[in-house]
Amino acid sequence: MVHLTPDEKAAVTALWGKVNVDEVGGEALGRLLVVYPWTQRFFESFGDLSSPDAVMGNPKVKAHGKKVLGAFSDGLAHLDNLKGTFAQLSELHCDKLHVDPENFKLLGNVLVCVLAHHFGKEFTPQVQAAYQKVVAGVANALAHKYH
């Protein structure tokens, strides 16, 4: 569960309504793979990840980034039940994919950077603070099955 004030919730919802999930999802996942290259081991089937340009232009990275942000959107609609919303994804990433749960925090922070880049002055410190709460809550929910 993420505890947002009514103003924080309104800010998160208003900005998210302007997010191009295809574009931001691909960019966020791509940046994760470039900035934290050890995360690429979970995406070996995606083909060429040999350079930043290859990663950022990879259609499988873009498609999976869109899928990731689709799940994030679901979480935004269920902020009061993030653990329930992400239970199946938590189990998948824990039991089958063996993803280090620290990677969820990294992706959340990268997403915040990408949102700041896309929205500039509209991404105020207050909006960032609200999004940091949300991505921390999502990362915690995704790591739930690890505990």
Curated annotation (Swiss-Prot):
Residues that bear N-acetylvaline: 2
CDD domains named in the record: Hb-beta-like
CC per GO annotation: blood microparticle; haptoglobin-hemoglobin complex; hemoglobin complex
Modified residues (Phosphoserine): 45
GO biological process: hydrogen peroxide catabolic process
Binding site for heme b: 64, 93
Tissue/organ expression: Red blood cells.
Protein origin, superkingdom: Eukaryota
PTM-bearing positions, type N6-acetyllysine: 60, 83, 145
Residues carrying S-nitrosocysteine: 94
Keyword Heme: yes
GO molecular function terms attached to this record: haptoglobin binding; heme binding; hemoglobin alpha binding; metal ion binding; organic acid binding; oxygen binding; oxygen carrier activity; peroxidase activity
Gene3D superfamilies: Globins
Phosphothreonine: residues bearing it: 13
Alphabetized UniProt keyword annotations: Acetylation, Heme, Iron, Metal-binding, Oxygen transport, Phosphoprotein, S-nitrosylation, Transport
Domain Globin: 3-147
InterPro entries in UniProt: Globin, Globin-like_sf, Globin/Proto, Hemoglobin_b, Hemoglobin_oxygen_transport
Assembly: Heterotetramer of two alpha chains and two beta chains.
Function summary: Involved in oxygen transport from the lung to the various peripheral tissues.
Family named by the database record: Belongs to the globin family.
Protein name: Hemoglobin subunit beta
Organism listed in the record: Colobus polykomos (Western black-and-white colobus monkey)
